[in-house]
């Protein structure tokens, strides 16, 4: 068995584009994946690659466990703050609370500045390949993505809550126990006991669609079960070979939020969140036909399910030049648990104190729940398309130790939604194997939801290909 099995262990990657290579650490540090990845790591990228030999041709099986990648990008926060808040979110810890002045600064920093986060976890992957049969693989992968961008008003309301300038009047509790209405003056509010402020009131309220103009909140968490097959279709000596592959995927949905507005009364806004998040929707829950409060003891209870397909085709020329094309995530998910549509109502007042720190994940209830900005109508279900992408890539082998290539990834959704890219991605990179047991990777990437980056990676190949372990970064600069 040792000579026929490749096992991938102890895998991790940092600052990565999760959807580019899913949780495959061996592809993370390269900047390109469409024609590079093999075995189960090709799932979700290009199923035609399953027709190729495994990386070590004498192996017939490949298996991997506990592979993960994550990325965070923000124009408003330092890299250290991003790392600290991400670690707090993973550990389900609450960070230190803002002072009033820190809230004011946070609102300024996040105005028009995007925040993107991706986390991908591959719990298990398996692949089998022979020349006669081709290649078949199965993989379980969790994909979590967050993207947000706020205009000035929304940024102030989210961080300052009832003291945001939009609310021009404040109801305060006096020492005598009486209440009084005062003007919301920043210089005066900073000196008040914040606990004495009951709520903020807008005397000239706006509809949420207008107030949210140009802002976006997108969240997606899905668990993907992917079964794919690929093989060689045509071969003409060592000059030309054609490969094709197909994959079918079953999705479980844990969370979905899509809130956008163009300011002209056209607002796309709905959410479906597992009961594990503990969001209180107030009175809207009682009338919601999809209300679900059941809690599972271990994993979050899913609130959506659907199917998708991947298609891929490769051309191999002279056993050196690879050209690949793939279309991934053709399908949809139907969300049928805790489904809510946001009503376009006037925003009169709020009792919210605003976000207490940058750990947004731990405060989703404050944003989406009954104390947040939104009012809801319950829905029985809603079906949304998967974030379909078209991938094109090519690579060339220079001897047995060097392979160089590029990738182009094009989102096809007309309007970017949860789990999708804001713009196309272009990447260049390659692998160098100076020693039989060491592989170095590097590249250059731009586009998607991130700035230009320089990925690097280091992989150790042990036991003549029986084991791989490594680490990679999507951006060596940050």
Give the residues covered by each predicted segment.
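Bacterial Sec-dependent N-terminal signal peptides
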Residues: 1-23, 394
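Short hydrophobic "helix-edge" motifs at membrane interfaces and signal-peptide entry regions
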Residues: 4, 35-38, 318-320
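N-terminal, post-signal peptide beta-strand-biased segments of exported outer-membrane/organellar beta-barrel
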Residues: 16-170
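Outer-membrane beta-barrel porins/channels
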Residues: 19-21, 132-133, 137-143, 147-478
């Amino acid at each position: 068995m040792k000579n026929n099995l490749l096992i991938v262990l102890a895998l991790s990657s940092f600052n990565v584009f999760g959807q580019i290579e899913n949780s495959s650490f061996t592809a993370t540090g390269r900047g390109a994946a469409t024609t590079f990845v093999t075995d189960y790591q090709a799932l979700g990228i290009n199923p035609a690659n399953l027709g190729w030999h495994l990386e070590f041709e004498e192996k017939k099986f490949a298996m991997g466990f506990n592979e993960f990648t994550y990325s965070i990008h923000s124009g408003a926060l330092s890299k250290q703050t991003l790392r600290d808040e991400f670690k707090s979110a993973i550990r389900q810890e609450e960070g230190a609370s803002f002072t009033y002045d820190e809230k004011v600064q946070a609102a300024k920093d996040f105005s028009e500045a995007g925040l993107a986060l991706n986390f991908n976890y591959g719990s298990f992957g398996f692949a089998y390949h022979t020349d006669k049969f081709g290649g078949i693989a199965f993989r379980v992968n969790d994909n979590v993505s967050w993207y947000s961008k706020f205009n000035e008003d929304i940024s102030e309301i989210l961080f300052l809550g009832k003291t945001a300038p939009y609310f021009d009047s404040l109801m305060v509790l006096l020492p005598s126990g009486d209440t009084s209405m005062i003007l919301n003056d920043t210089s005066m509010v900073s000196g008040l006991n914040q606990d004495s402020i009951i709520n903020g009131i807008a005397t000239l309220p706006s509809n949420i669609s207008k107030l949210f103009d140009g802002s976006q909140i997108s969240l997606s968490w899905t668990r993907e079960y992917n079964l794919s097959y690929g093989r060689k279709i045509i071969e003409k000596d060592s000059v030309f070979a054609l490969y094709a592959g197909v994959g079918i995927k079953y999705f479980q949905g844990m969370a979905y939020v899509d809130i956008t507005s163009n300011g002209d009364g056209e607002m796309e806004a709905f959410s479906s969140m597992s009961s594990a998040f503990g969001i209180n929707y107030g009175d809207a829950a009682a009338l919601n036909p999809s209300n679900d409060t059941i809690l599972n003891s271990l994993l979050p209870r899913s609130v959506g399910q659907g199917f998708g397909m991947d298609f891929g085709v490769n051309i191999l020329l002279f056993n050196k030049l690879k050209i690949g094309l793939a279309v991934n995530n053709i399908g949809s998910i139907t969300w049928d648990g805790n489904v809510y549509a946001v009503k376009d109502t006037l925003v009169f007042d709020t009792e919210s104190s605003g976000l207490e720190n940058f750990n947004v994940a731990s405060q989703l209830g404050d944003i989406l729940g009954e104390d947040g900005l939104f009012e809801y109508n319950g829905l029985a279900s809603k079906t949304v398309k998967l974030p379909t992408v078209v991938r094109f890539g090519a690579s060339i082998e220079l001897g047995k130790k060097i392979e160089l290539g590029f990738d182009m990834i094009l989102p096809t959704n007309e309007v970017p939604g949860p789990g999708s890219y804001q713009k196309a991605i272009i990447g260049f990179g390659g692998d160098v194997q100076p020693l039989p047991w060491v592989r170095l990777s590097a590249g250059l990437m731009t586009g998607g939801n991130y700035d230009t980056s320089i990925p690097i990676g280091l992989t150790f190949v042990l036991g003549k290909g029986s084991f791989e372990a490594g680490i990679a970064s999507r951006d060596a600069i940050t």
